[in-house]
Design a protein with these regions (language model features):
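Ribonuclease/tRNase effector modules and their secretory precursors
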Residues: 1-85
């Protein structure tokens, strides 16, 4: 399995003070995962901590090959915090 970042995943990096390593850590070791649809490739919503302990929300494409592509990453919004309870 290989995980990579699409440029769209970097959209909020400056605003949220996150970098590629933060995104990859949160995507690789998520606390919470849910499928968003049954399309191919499948989209997953993931919540995970970055290297500084901040909770990130991510959307990851899962390909048949097992490779993954992060297409969205940002500081988790309040609406997602309840998912961890």
């Amino acid at each position: 399995m290989k995980i990579s970042l699409h440029n769209s995943a970097r959209k909020h990096q400056e605003r949220d003070h996150i970098n590629d390593d933060d995104i990859l850590k949160a995507a690789t070791f998520p606390l919470w995962v849910a499928a968003l649809d049954d399309e191919n490739p499948q989209r997953e919503l993931r919540l995970g901590f970055d290297n500084a302990g901040r909770l990130l929300e991510l959307v990851v494409l899962i390909f048949d090959s097992g490779n993954e592509l992060v297409i969205h990453a940002m500081k988790a919004r309040a609406q997602y915090l309840d998912l961890l309870n």
